[in-house]
Regions:
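Active-site neighborhoods and metal-handling regions in enzymes and metal-associated proteins
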Residues: 1-228
């Protein structure tokens, strides 16, 4: 919160629908909307951080799932597959395509790898409001839904479970968990359509710099797919 305010912006989540915090912090089998607490993280955990910001009258919304120490190869594959599906979805955000083109690209990539695609939670348009039309589900049929036009801005955010797609909503009114208590991951980018093609408004580069990851190498194939 201090960093956001120091950069002349306001927390986008704090107080939104009465949410009590600046960040959504969701470890392991929490899918989204986790409320920060003081429980220590352990080697092998994963944790998704979702952050919203309001600056100059417009919202940004962004999420990344971090790994803590050494994780299993099974969890690494889940992370890789979900992140790949984010970029495959972004590739479909072009003039003349429809919401279902993004949805089916994300769904097919994850389900073909054996993962559950959450149904109850979706991506969305954004701008002067945090959640605007259209909804961007991570499941659907190619060619269905609202047609994309230049100038649209959307948040694409795969929420992918290692096991079942089913989730439970906890009594705190916010936290969503996988029904089978297997891990879940969440990645999110904001994308504008300019000249009929996707333009990223968010970046993971600051995260990659902090973690010592060479982001260009990691994402090269994904951006090649988008540009082609």
């Amino acid at each position: 919160e201090e960093f956001i305010r120091d950069n002349d912006a306001e927390p986008g989540f704090l107080g939104m629908y009465d949410f009590p915090n600046t960040l959504c912090v969701s470890p392991n089998y929490e899918v989204v909307h986790g409320i920060p607490n003081k429980k220590p993280l352990q080697d092998g955990d994963i944790i998704s951080i979702d952050c919203g910001v309001l600056k100059n009258g417009f919202y940004g919304d962004h999420a990344y799932t971090f790994k803590i120490g050494e994780i299993t190869t099974e969890i690494q594959k889940l992370l890789d597959t979900a992140l790949e599906s984010l970029y495959l979805g972004i590739r479909e955000f072009k003039e003349g395509n429809r919401v279902g083109d993004i949805s089916s690209a994300i769904q097919n990539h994850n389900e073909s790898n054996g993962y559950g695609v959450v149904r109850e939670l979706v991506g969305h348009g954004l701008g002067k409001d945090l959640h605007e039309s259209p909804e961007i589900p991570n499941f659907g049929k190619k060619g269905n839904g609202k047609k994309f036009v230049n100038g649209m801005v959307i948040a694409i955010e795969p929420m992918i479970n290692m096991g079942t797609e089913k989730v439970n909503f906890l009594s705190d009114g916010w936290t969503v968990e996988t029904a089978d208590k297997l891990p879940s991951v969440h990645f999110e980018h904001d994308v504008a359509m300019i000249d009929g093609k996707p333009l990223l408004l968010s970046t993971f580069d600051f995260i990659y710099d902090a973690l010592g990851i060479k982001s260009n190498e990691e994402n090269e194939f994904k951006w090649n797919e988008i540009s082609n």
